[in-house]
């Protein structure tokens, strides 16, 4: 906010704070008097000597005005409400008081009728008082009643005589005229009326009276002309403030700012932040340097539109609040009616929505507030140049009425492709260095099409010649994107590597929602009129009139929707998350939808990274919980929509929490870390409850049933095409596996389930001696709020098995305990799924999610001796977090050997029968060195289409280390035991500790790599580090990052391998990526998020090219952030432990990040901190804990800290970093990276992580406004 520069001492300099607690009697030791019901500020009465428990601050003095209680402004509240605030505050209480005198005394009416400069502390305090008054009072007016207004709620309608009587009696705190009618603000009653009691009794500290349903300040009352009193001499000596644009804000404009919302013309009286009662002089001087949207000289001569309000930022910049849409904008809406096309503007004026910035560093540039972009070229000159250069055919733009850019009526939206009206066409585009050569618009709302905004000349789309402006994007590589968000589709396109192609299905016939020829709306030059080759013919047709006609003639670019339910159009890529949610748009795993359907209420899991200014969205209270009120940063909140109900935050249910408690939880989330949200969208939501009949059935059953009665199928024929089996052995129901109707079959399977509830549970299985033994289990799961709690793999091609992927910790499947990763899914609610596609299974789970339960039949290989598998599918000591593991390609289901686990060091039973040789390797080390090898532990994910085998293997051998010298250990060797103790089911951390305690020698029982007959599981170079592999041709061949991933499970990172049967699988052409350490992350706590939609708009007015935070969401001409991309089906952000490139431009005070580590400190280099509002945090990709792999193209392996600083400095104003996604936790000095647990002490690679050596070496790359982080060695030059 802008504050006046004062020559004399202002009353705010006398404000003091007292911190007190309740005394042993539970009392505060002072009386409270005054209150709005008496027309007074609340003030201190008798202060009882010796009864006040002071903790700090000054003493309380009788008769002083009470301004705040624990930062909650109380001026304008009744005594009852002030006491309620104090009652709900926990000790200690922080009271801000001021001595009466000058303009502030106990008389509210006197203070409210003073006239102050807009943006001053006094003006803000007046607004706070009015906000608080309207909690308890209703304005009165002499004007006639309007339609839709409720007497006694919107206004008290009285006669002129009654109004004059109230005025004479002193019952009005404010009064005046507006449009020849009298308006007044009566004193609130001491006890609230029943109408207002329920709403305002919930005022708690921190929950300012901004909840929906509170009293609102009326436009007429706010804008009424009052006989305002000039403030006394103390305030007359304040100098008017120049608002950064040369426009002096005069006191006469102070009262014309609040507008209304609702039938009666009212505005939600969101309270202003508590005034800052003291201000350093250096901050006061900053006001003259601010930049803002320049209001017209006569801006106050025209009223703002209804429900709009003018406000000021802390720097004095003008912005506008639209209470209709609950959004903020830098644009003055009054100027919209005066808008004209850019080409008609004079050279010394700018089009509507544009602003000129003169920056001392970057020079002059222009801000387009409509499209939120910046450019160096004058938009008027640009428009005139384009008009002449392109010979635009629609020159009649200048004859259009003067209005805001011509937005057209939004077409009727549909998620059903068959309902689209227009002609369909398909095209295939190959990604080039400039992207796909077109820009898109739309998708900012759930019911908005994504359309081609422009085609870039000479780009792939222009060269193809088929795409045109306005085309609706329907399918991208068989993924229907109708209803997808803009950010999702952008990420999908960005995930395609350069040189790869995508198939697009477009629908032509929908106009853009704006005039594409209007330069004010253009992100790129308008599409040039050019000769195009005739479109490619598909099956002899150029286009098709209807979508059904189109898909009936071609099946190459879109899936067949004729044999699936309509909702299957919303299918996602393979690998399903069967928890009833859509996949998180920015989460790291490629998962398919298994929600309740696009047209039904649905639960979604989103992952949002908190920035320096919060999460970028606001929340509001509602009868069903906290809902998303406004999206302030669309790019920062991908997948989130206004109106979404927040169900969980980081696995904590928040439905029954108050607004304040949810805000506090969001505040506690650290900056730069991922926060997981489960939100509910659509429908009327209440926590899921099982219907009574279902509860009765569950209770009658006693315990969950396990049916293991079906004959096992030999592995040589794992998926017989004619395999048929009913849901229960006694059932005679049959289903056609060729083309089942999921709806009909679901009803049948439900009837089967209900018919068997009287049958006692049975557990039996039969074995077929002709092949490996299997057993089938029936698993009944009830859907929790987070879903069924497991994921699905496979089914990418017909005939591939459908497998259970990761079992989510604390989910429904995990609590049930019977479902294991690697189980083959045979039936879903009695419907056979063997050989079916992934999408088909996901569709079945949609129906199950809607009904709250599912019956699954899974097939599991039987262990030797017929011993059952462990129930939990994980080792006991595993740590469970929700970071994601690296990508894993689906491995072909192949023949596998199997053996039972062993509890001792002897070879597991069954190894000899398969000619697998184990050997003992003894490694000796010296005192000053480590053993020199790295252990990699797999997670609880299926491998080769079955279970995880020996989960621990050698991932790296250090040159010259004891492990290297013994010449008996190779990369890829599986470790069975350490010093005679089996580690198959041991958590990774325990293995490290076991080796640590081994002393100077350790004995490893291993299965050599060559015995596994699995050459693809490890690189042939046995000493090549995983890190270095990324830069070698071999690594490009075998690296998970370089391979397409048709199916990707989402496994909790820290979860070690489950106690699965010991099986040695052969899996040709399968590429695995393994997690290499624990992920026990606990980042720092930082800044709170936004909770008020009236916050100023996000400042996107950075100089062009000055902030490479993210590629423009509307332009695909950006290079992919890293050439090692994932396949198209995986279009979310890089996953944990992925490699990615960050380019940054240096800010005024540096790059805004600090680093830790270096060779001299025996650790790799990591990102230590991100300075608030610095280039690094604005970039959005770098996070705390990321490992720095390269600096300006130079590898950081064995790099010293000083060399890293030198490289950053040598890059000048730009730096290019290759980073490896970390865990959010920075390793302590003397620790090896948390992503690698090394058993060594070599000089090159550091000491074991369990020793603490040396001192930290943290280097800061500061940014403006950030305190330097020690030591002050900054990357600034």
From Swiss-Prot:
Residue ranges occupied by any PDZ domain in the UniProt entry: 17-101, 426-510, 605-683, 778-860, 920-1010, 1141-1223
Keyword check for Lipid metabolism: no
Record key words, sorted: Cell membrane, Cell projection, Cytoplasm, Cytoskeleton, Endocytosis, Endosome, Membrane, Neurogenesis, Phosphoprotein, Repeat, Synapse, Synaptosome
Domain WW: start-end pairs: 302-335, 348-381
Summary of the tissues where the protein is detected: Expressed in the foot process layer of podocytes of the kidney glomeruli but not in tubules (at protein level). Expressed in the brain.
Residues that bear Phosphoserine: 686, 884-885
Ranges where the record places region Interaction with DDN: 302-381
Membrane topology category: Peripheral membrane protein
GO molecular function: activin receptor binding; beta-1 adrenergic receptor binding; kinesin binding; phosphatase binding; protein-containing complex binding; signaling receptor complex adaptor activity; SMAD binding; structural constituent of postsynaptic density
GO BP field: cellular response to nerve growth factor stimulus; clathrin-dependent endocytosis; glomerular filtration; negative regulation of activin receptor signaling pathway; negative regulation of cell migration; negative regulation of cell population proliferation; negative regulation of phosphatidylinositol 3-kinase/protein kinase B signal transduction; nerve growth factor signaling pathway
Region spans: Disordered: 205-308, 556-575, 869-913, 1011-1130
Domain Guanylate kinase-like, residue spans: 109-283
Annotated localization: Cytoplasm; Late endosome; Synapse, Synaptosome; Cell membrane
InterPro entries hit by this protein: GK/Ca_channel_bsu, Guanylate_kin-like_dom, Guanylate_kinase_CS, P-loop_NTPase, PDZ, PDZ_sf, WW_dom, WW_dom_sf
Biased composition (Basic and acidic residues): 281-296, 1069-1085
Record's GO cellular component terms: bicellular tight junction; cell-cell junction; centriole; centrosome; ciliary base; cytoplasm; dendrite; extrinsic component of postsynaptic membrane
Low complexity: compositionally biased ranges: 894-908
Chief location category: cytoplasm
Signal peptide: none
Residues bearing PTM Phosphotyrosine: 362, 827
Function comment: Seems to act as scaffold molecule at synaptic junctions by assembling neurotransmitter receptors and cell adhesion proteins. Plays a role in nerve growth factor (NGF)-induced recruitment of RAPGEF2 to late endosomes and neurite outgrowth. May play a role in regulating activin-mediated signaling in neuronal cells. Enhances the ability of PTEN to suppress AKT1 activation. Plays a role in receptor-mediated clathrin-dependent endocytosis which is required for ciliogenesis.
Similarity remark: Belongs to the MAGUK family.
The protein, known as: Membrane-associated guanylate kinase, WW and PDZ domain-containing protein 2
Lineage: Eukaryota, Metazoa, Chordata, Craniata, Vertebrata
Protein encoded by which gene: Magi2
């Amino acid at each position: 906010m802008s504050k006046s520069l004062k020559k004399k001492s202002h009353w705010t300099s006398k404000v003091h704070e007292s911190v007190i607690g309740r005394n042993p009697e539970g009392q505060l030791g002072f009386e409270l008097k005054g209150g709005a019901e008496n027309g007074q500020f609340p003030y201190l009465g008798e202060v009882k000597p010796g009864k006040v428990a002071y903790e700090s601050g000054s003493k309380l003095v009788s008769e002083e005005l009470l301004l705040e209680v624990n930062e909650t402004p109380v001026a304008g509240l009744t005594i009852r409400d002030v006491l309620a605030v104090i009652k709900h505050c926990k000790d200690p209480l922080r009271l801000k008081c001021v001595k009466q005198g000058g303009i502030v005394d106990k008389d509210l009416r006197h203070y409210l009728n003073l006239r102050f400069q807009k943006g001053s502390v006094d003006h803000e305090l007046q607004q706070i008082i009015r906000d608080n008054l309207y909690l308890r009072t209703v304005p009165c007016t002499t004007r006639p009643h309007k339609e839709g207004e409720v007497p006694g709620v919107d206004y008290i309608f009285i006669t002129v005589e009654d109004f004059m009587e109230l005025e004479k009696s002193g019952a009005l705190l404010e009064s005046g005229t507006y449009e020849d009618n009298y308006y007044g603000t009566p004193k609130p009653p001491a006890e609230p009326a029943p109408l207002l009691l329920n709403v305002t009794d919930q005022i708690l500290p921190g929950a300012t009276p901004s909840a929906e349903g509170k009293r609102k300040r009326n436009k007429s009352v706010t804008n009424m002309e009052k006989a305002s009193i000039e403030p006394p001499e103390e305030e007359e000596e304040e100098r008017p403030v120049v608002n950064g644009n040369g426009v002096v804000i005069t006191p006469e404009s102070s009262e014309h700012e609040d507008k209304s919302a609702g039938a009666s013309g009212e505005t939600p009286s969101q309270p202003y932040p508590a005034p800052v009662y003291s201000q350093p002089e250096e901050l006061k001087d900053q006001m003259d340097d601010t930049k803002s949207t320049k209001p017209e000289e006569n801006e106050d001569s025209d009223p703002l539109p209804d429900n709009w309000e003018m406000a000021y930022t802390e720097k004095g910049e003008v912005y506008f609040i639209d209470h209709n849409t609950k959004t903020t904008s830098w644009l003055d809406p009054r100027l919209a009616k005066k808008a004209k096309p850019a080409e008609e503007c004079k050279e010394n004026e700018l089009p509507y929505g544009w602003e000129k910035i003169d920056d001392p560093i970057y020079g002059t540039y222009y801000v387009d507030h409509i499209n939120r972009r910046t450019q160096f070229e004058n938009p008027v000159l640009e428009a005139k140049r384009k008009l002449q250069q392109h010979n635009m055919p629609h020159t009649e733009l200048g004859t259009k009425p003067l209005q805001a850019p011509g937005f057209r009526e939004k077409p009727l939206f549909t998620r059903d492709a068959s309902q689209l009206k227009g002609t369909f066409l398909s095209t295939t585009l190959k990604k080039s260095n400039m992207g796909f050569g077109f820009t898109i618009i739309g998708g900012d709302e759930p019911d908005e099409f994504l359309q081609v905004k422009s085609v870039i000349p000479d780009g792939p789309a222009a060269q193809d010649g088929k795409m045109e402006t306005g085309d609706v994007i329907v399918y991208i590589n068989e993924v229907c994107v109708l209803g997808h968000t803009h950010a999702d589709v952008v990420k999908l396109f960005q995930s395609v590597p350069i040189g790869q192609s995508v198939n697009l299905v477009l629908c032509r016939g929908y106009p853009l929602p704006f005039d594409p020829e209007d330069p004010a709306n253009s992100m790129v030059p308008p599409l040039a009129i050019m000769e195009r080759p005739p479109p490619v013919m598909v099956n002899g047709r150029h286009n098709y009139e209807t979508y059904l006609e189109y898909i009936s003639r071609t099946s190459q670019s879109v899936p067949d929707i004729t044999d699936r339910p309509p909702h299957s159009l919303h299918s996602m890529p393979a690998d399903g998350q069967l928890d009833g949610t859509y996949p998180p748009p920015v989460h790291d795993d490629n998962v398919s939808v298994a929600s309740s359907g696009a047209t039904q209420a649905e639960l979604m899991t989103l992952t949002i990274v908190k920035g320096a200014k919060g999460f970028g969205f606001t929340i509001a209270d509602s009868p069903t919980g906290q809902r998303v009120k406004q999206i302030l940063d669309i790019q920062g909140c991908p997948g989130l929509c206004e109106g979404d109900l927040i169900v969980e935050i980081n696995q904590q249910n928040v439905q029954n929490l108050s607004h304040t408690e949810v805000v506090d939880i969001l505040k506690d989330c650290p900056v730069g870390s991922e926060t997981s949200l489960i939100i509910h969208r659509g429908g009327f939501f209440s926590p899921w409850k099982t219907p009574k009949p279902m509860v009765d059935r569950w209770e009658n059953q006693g315990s969950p049933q396990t049916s293991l009665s079906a004959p096992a199928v030999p592995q040589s024929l794992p998926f017989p095409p004619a395999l048929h089996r009913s849901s229960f052995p006694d059932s005679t129901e049959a289903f056609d596996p060729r083309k089942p109707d999921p709806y009909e079959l679901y009803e049948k399977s439900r009837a089967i389930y209900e018919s068997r509830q009287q049958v006692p549970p049975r557990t039996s299985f039969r074995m077929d001696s002709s092949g490996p033994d299997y057993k089938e289990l029936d698993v009944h799961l009830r859907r929790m709020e987070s879903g069924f709690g497991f994921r699905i793999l496979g089914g990418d091609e017909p005939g591939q098995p459908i497998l259970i992927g990761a079992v989510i910790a604390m989910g429904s499947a995990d609590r049930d305990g019977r479902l294991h990763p690697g189980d083959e899914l045979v039936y879903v609610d009695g419907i056979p799924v063997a050989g079916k596609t992934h999408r088909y299974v996901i569709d079945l789970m949609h129906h199950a999610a809607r009904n709250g339960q599912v019956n699954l039949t899974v097939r599991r290989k039987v262990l030797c001796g017929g011993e059952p598998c462990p129930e939990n599918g994980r080792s006991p000591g595993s740590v469970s977090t929700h970071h994601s593991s690296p990508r894993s390609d689906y491995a072909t289901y192949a023949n596998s050997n199997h053996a039972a686990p062993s509890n001792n060091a002897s070879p597991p039973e069954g190894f000899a029968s398969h000619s697998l040789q184990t050997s003992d390797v003894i490694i000796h080390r010296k005192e000053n060195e480590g053993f020199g090898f790295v252990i990699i532990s797999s997670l609880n994910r299926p491998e080769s289409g079955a279970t995880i085998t020996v989960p621990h293997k050698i991932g790296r051998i250090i040159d010259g280390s004891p492990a290297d010298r013994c010449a008996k250990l190779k990369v890829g060797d599986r470790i069975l035991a350490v010093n005679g103790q089996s580690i198959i089911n041991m958590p990774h951390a325990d293995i490290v500790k076991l080796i640590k305690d081994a002393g100077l020698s350790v004995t490893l029982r291993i299965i050599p790599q060559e015995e596994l007959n699995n050459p693809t599981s490890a690189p042939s170079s046995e000493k090549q580090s995983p890190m270095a592999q990324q830069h070698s041709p071999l690594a490009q061949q075998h690296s998970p990052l370089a391979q397409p991933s048709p199916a990707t499970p989402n496994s909790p990172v820290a979860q070690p391998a489950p106690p699965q049967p010991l099986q040695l699988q052969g899996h040709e052409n399968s590429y695995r990526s393994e997690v290499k350490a624990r992920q026990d992350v606990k980042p720092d706590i930082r800044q709170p998020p936004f909770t008020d939609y009236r916050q100023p708009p996000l400042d996107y007015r950075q100089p062009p090219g000055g902030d490479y935070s993210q590629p423009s969401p509307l332009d695909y001409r950006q290079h992919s952030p890293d050439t090692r991309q994932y396949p198209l089906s995986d279009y979310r952000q890089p996953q944990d432990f992925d490699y990615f490139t960050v380019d940054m431009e240096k800010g005024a005070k540096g790059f805004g990040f600090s680093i830790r580590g270096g060779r001299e400190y025996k650790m790799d280099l990591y990102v230590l901190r991100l300075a608030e509002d610095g280039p690094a945090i604005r970039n959005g990709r770098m996070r705390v804990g990321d490992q720095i792999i390269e600096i300006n193209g130079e590898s950081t392996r064995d790099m010293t800290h000083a060399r890293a600083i030198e490289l950053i400095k040598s890059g000048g104003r730009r730096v290019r970093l290759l980073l490896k996604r970390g865990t959010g936790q920075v390793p302590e000095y003397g620790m090896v990276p948390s992503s690698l647990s090394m058993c060594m002490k070599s000089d090159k690679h550091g000491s074991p992580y369990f020793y603490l050596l040396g001192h930290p070496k943290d280097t800061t790359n500061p940014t403006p406004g950030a305190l330097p982080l020690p030591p002050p060695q900054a990357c600034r030059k």
